[in-house]
Amino acid sequence: MSEINQNVKDSRQQYYQHISGQNLTPLWESLHHLVPQTPNANCAPAYWNYQEIRPLLMESGNVIGAKEAIRRVLVLENPALRGQSSITATLYAGLQLILPGEVAPSHRHNQSALRFIVEGKGAFTAVDGERTPMHTGDFILTPQWRWHDHGNPGSEPVVWLDGLDLPLVNLLGCGFAEDCPEDQQPVTRKEGDYLPRYAANMLPLRHQRGNSSPIFNYRYDRSREALHDLTRMGDPDEWEGYKLRYVNPVTGGYPMPSMGAFLQLLPKGFASRVARSTDSTIYHVVEGAGQVTIGNETFHFSAKDIFVAPTWHEVSFRSSEDTVLFSFSDKPVQEALGLFREARY
């Protein structure tokens, strides 16, 4: 029987080599992988201790200037995706440093980008002719094809977490970019111009709707206050604690079409139940400390640390003190395609 099986195997292998010359391959050899019963893990659970990598990030300031680098970033590469500049199969993340007196030159691209400020003060981001100051915990958007630059006229280094849909856009083969003739784009609107127009539950009469939120700085003091107020309204969700999502005030949807962003508070002593979802999610610890179990791995985290939970991995949290987590994922894309799924246990 084994001899017959080996003969069949050899015959098939000869056939596969024969059809390969015509750029053909047999589906039956890969069908179970292509159409799995449950999602294939396309990245691995991973964790970055900020206090360990911070000296390396600061050292990059001596290696290259912000203008030469264009964006001086240490990419957070998933250990299962080394060499691909990806933290998940669809998303990119990195830590960007801008030193006092530096400017990160203006450019634009059709990849959507988000910034979450990790530390420092005195820097700004300019988007589409308007500047906004960057404070720790602020969530800042640079939407598709909008001119944006960063500057630091302050006296201390400023670091933020970058999140982009680079792998997704590159997979689709539709990436475009353009450099601005000047390092800094002209400022055409007053600082805070977006606030009375879009951040007070009202809209200008003749607002022209785009595909991203017109609010490009979701200030942490306001978001944190919302979480605090929510804790007074009832008990936390058993899986997520107190969790809110950032929204586009025009549509009620996500701030950007390809990435959803969230902020959640885990009260001191909170132990969540287990959940999993199809959107691989990147987490940044804004405040607090605790531990997270992702699949079979447990990571102990503290403020400013970063970790990633891959698709369809069971996730649970324990907080040793009041903890605030910022997170982002490709959930909007999955929902738009009717693919998103979650389970709670």
Question: What do the PLM-derived regions correspond to, one by one?
Answer:
Residues 1-88, 185-258, 262:
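A short, N-terminal "cap"/entry segment at the start of jelly-roll beta-barrel domains
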Residues 2-15, 153-216, 319-345:
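Double-stranded beta-helix
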Residues 47-50, 94, 161:
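Activation on folded, globular domain regions of eukaryotic proteins
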Residues 81-92, 99-113, 129, 251-260, ...:
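A short beta-loop-beta micro-motif enriched in histidine and acidic residues
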Residues 99-136, 142-146, 275-303:
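A short beta-strand-loop-beta hairpin characteristic of the jelly-roll/cupin
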Residues 127, 133-154, 160-165, 294, ...:
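Conserved metal-binding segment of the jelly-roll/cupin
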Residues 241, 258-261, 279-280, 287-289, ...:
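Active-site lining segments that contact anionic ligands and/or coordinate catalytic metals
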Residues 250-252, 259-265, 275-278, 288, ...:
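C-terminal structured domain segments across diverse proteins
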